[in-house]
Amino acid sequence: MKALVIGGGIGGLSAAVGLKNAGIHCEVFEAVKEIKPVGAAISIWPNGVKCMKHLGMGDIIESYGGPMHFLAYKDYLRGEDLTQFSLAPLVERTGGRPCPVPALNLQREMLDFWGRDAVQFGKRVTRCEEHADGVRVWFTDGSMAEGDFLIAADGSHSALRPYVLGYTPERRYAGYVNWNGLVEIDEAIAPGNQWTTFVGEGKRVSLMPVSDGRFYFFFDVPLPAGLAEDRSTLRADLSRYFSGWAPQVQKLIAALDPQTTNRIEIHDIEPFERLVRGKVALLGDAGHSTTPDIGQGGCAALEDAVVLGDLFRESRDIAGVLRQYEAQRCDRVRDLVLKARKRCDVTHGKDMALTQAWYQELETETGERIINGLCETIQGGPLG
């Protein structure tokens, strides 16, 4: 039995590993010649960590996951704590620690784990079709591949999604721009073992520790889409948007490198009613394009891969397995997309009265409510 996996990112590679572990031969195709992650880092929460370990890639997370032991929200003007608490109760309840990981390291290590030579690069898919014995897929270079079934893990701009859904869904602008990158840890900005977030005015500035003594940082600003901003104006743009913010935020703006800082207009897509058509299944961002507001995009792709691989361990009935995959994943990923959207709206001042109420809640937060919410999301995954 042979699977065609379209996409060599986190979703595609984890799917390929899961299928290989189930004894299925996979061919992996990637559109670009060199994968460059869109964001500087990825949040791998305990549900994702469990999935990586389940797939046999736990060492990658242990090597590159940052020491995120505490969580704090800070006032945007004074830089003083609104709330600060240990994440130890979350680790105890979920059986794993949260691991922010540099995206480039994660991508590279997963690629090495699978085998770089086992990925066909420069293969941009144009279409697919099913036939009695399996599936065919065509690429822009005129080549074609055949397999018994196909996993479309070709990202949020998936070319194969319309085949599965029967329509082309529109991406929805979430209403804010995100700048992100990596800087050396500076305790004058934030503790090196803490996820620190400054909030105010419907904006946020956040830092998470990753490997090699670095912070993953991001700035969020509610803005119209399509503004003429690029790296040449980046520091000035951030200085303007965060004028008057706390000294730590100003230090971060001064410390970042505009040439390695990403600027992304954040989108999501309305959750889908289906993830499968016949012998073709959507996986990862192709199947559930979400905002990053609860940090579950990468974790959801890993969950997809675990469910898919485990189902094929139990059965070789392709149609039946893919139906079960859809049944097990549709509600879960819908929940994650909509939770992220709700969190996005509160964080970014869609209704400033609600956002101000959240800021006030943070002043009385002991950690219990936030940890309960995180645990509910994490424990909804396939590995508990």
UniProtKB/Swiss-Prot annotation:
Pathway: Purine metabolism; urate degradation. It is an enzyme of class 1 (oxidoreductase). Disruption phenotype: Mutants fail to grow with hypoxanthine, xanthine or urate as the sole nitrogen source, but can grow with allantoin and allantoate. This is FAD-dependent urate hydroxylase. The record marks 204 as: Involved in substrate activation for the transfer of oxygen from the flavin hydroperoxide. Catalyzes the hydroxylation of uric acid to 5-hydroxyisourate. Substrate binds at residues 178, 204, 216-218. It catalyses: urate + NADH + O2 + H(+) = 5-hydroxyisourate + NAD(+) + H2O. Its cofactor is FAD. Its EC number is 1.14.13.113. Keywords: FAD, Flavoprotein, Monooxygenase, NAD, Oxidoreductase, Purine metabolism. It comes from the Bacteria. FAD binds at residues 11, 30-31, 43, 125, 285, 295-299. Belongs to the FAD-dependent urate hydroxylase family. One of its GO terms (molecular function) is FAD-dependent urate hydroxylase activity. PANTHER family: MONOOXYGENASE, PUTATIVE (AFU_ORTHOLOGUE AFUA_6G14510)-RELATED. GO terms for biological process: purine nucleobase metabolic process; urate catabolic process.
